From Swiss-Prot:
Primary role: IGPS catalyzes the conversion of PRFAR and glutamine to IGP, AICAR and glutamate. The HisH subunit catalyzes the hydrolysis of glutamine to glutamate and ammonia as part of the synthesis of IGP and AICAR. The resulting ammonia molecule is channeled to the active site of HisF.
EC number(s) given by UniProt: 4.3.2.10, 3.5.1.2
Location within or outside the cell: Cytoplasm
Organism: Desulfovibrio desulfuricans (strain ATCC 27774 / DSM 6949 / MB)
UniProt lineage: Bacteria, Pseudomonadati, Thermodesulfobacteriota, Desulfovibrionia, Desulfovibrionales
Gene: hisH
Subunit structure: Heterodimer of HisH and HisF.
Designated name of the protein: Imidazole glycerol phosphate synthase subunit HisH
Length: 217
């Protein structure tokens, strides 16, 4: 079972529907015990970093996420979740979770696309990924696939963690992580077949990791 973290920040239901479409057992929860028992955790979200951090702290879920990371449970951050796994955000000058080294910055005003046309903020719509390093989440997905983005801020994790980049006004990290902890700036649950395949790959990684842990006992 995958746990979808519920901290009143938006798109948990769309993630659940995507997983249910795949036949993946899942539950939306704010219960730390359910997080601990899950094969993996999805940390989605839309909204502002400061408000999200307040909501996490009020529910004790900031500590729960740190426990998930320390236990080595598979974890997937999506959009706002991707951003606040880092140490800080320029949005609300927020101190964020600090599970992953890096910062979140706002897109510059008056950006331009490569063809000279305006690149308004927020970045909203479909865009592709440029793979930087191999990632099991992208297995079986056409490299030309596009994913759905909605964001005004972009992430700058430790460069060694960058798995894919996207270009919109500037080139930014759109997928980062390693060893079962990943984060996507785009919305896989809203990205059609490529996004569903990514979520399915995450579940398969979680399932195999759980089986390996049981066999090791």
């Amino acid at each position: 079972m995958l746990a979808i973290l519920d901290y009143k920040a938006g798109n948990q239901t769309s993630v659940r529907r995507a997983l249910e479409h795949l036949g993946v057992p899942c539950a939306i929860t704010a219960d730390p015990a359910m997080l601990e028992s899950a094969a993996g955790v999805i940390f989605p979200g839309v909204g502002a970093a400061g408000q999200a951090m307040s909501a996490l702290a009020e529910a004790g879920l900031d500590k729960a996420l740190h426990h998930v990371a320390r236990r080595g449970q598979p974890l997937l951050g999506i959009c706002l979740g991707c951003q606040i796994l880092l140490e800080s955000s320029e949005e609300n000058a927020a101190k964020t979770l600090g599970i992953v080294p890096g910062v979140c910055r706002r897109f510059e005003d008056h950006m331009r696309q490569e063809d000279g046309s305006a690149a308004p903020v927020p970045h909203m719509g479909w865009n592709s990924l440029e793979a930087v390093a191999p990632c099991v989440l992208l297995d079986g997905i056409d490299p030309a696939s596009e994913y759905y983005f909605v964001h005004s801020y972009y992430v700058e994790p430790d460069p060694s963690l960058v798995l894919a980049t996207t270009t919109y006004g500037r080139t930014f990290c759109s997928l980062y992580g390693r060893d079962g902890l990943w984060a996507a700036q785009f919305h896989p649950e809203k990205s059609g077949r490529p996004g569903l395949r990514l979520l399915g790959n995450f579940y398969e990684y979680c399932r195999q990791s759980r089986q390996e842990a049981r066999h090791a006992q």
